[in-house]
Design a protein with these regions (language model features):
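Terminal targeting signals and extreme-terminal segments of soluble enzymes
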Residues: 1-103
Length: 105
């Protein structure tokens, strides 16, 4: 496998499908591991939050909790709560749900 295809496969782990205005989905990809790496879920929640922001704001602060382990073979739904849209800051709360269980907030 060449470097380009490895990079492309890696980036596919972060592609979220828009389901509704504030709901996104990741369909799960078997890459040889049973459990999802926590950094992947963190990145996906940040991507979901960014997809709900119209103006150019950058992440200033990020707080999260891992509640349950995630499974690589199963889809994850990301729900975004729009807490505040201001001139300087935008606040979002994102929940990652897998099989009706909250795995990350």
């Amino acid at each position: 496998m060449n470097k380009k295809s490895v990079l492309k496969k890696s980036l596919e782990l972060f592609e979220l499908e828009k389901i509704d205005r504030d709901i996104f989905s990741w369909n799960g990809k078997n890459v040889g591991y049973k459990r999802i790496f926590g950094g992947q879920v963190m990145a996906q929640t940040l991507i979901a939050a960014y997809k709900t922001i119209d103006v150019e704001h950058f992440a200033h602060s990020y707080h999260s909790y891992f509640l349950r382990p995630g499974d690589m073979d199963k889809s994850i739904t990301f729900t975004v709560d729009r807490i505040r849209d201001g001139k300087s800051f935008t606040t979002r709360s994102v929940k990652a749900i897998q099989e009706l269980s909250l795995i990350h907030i």
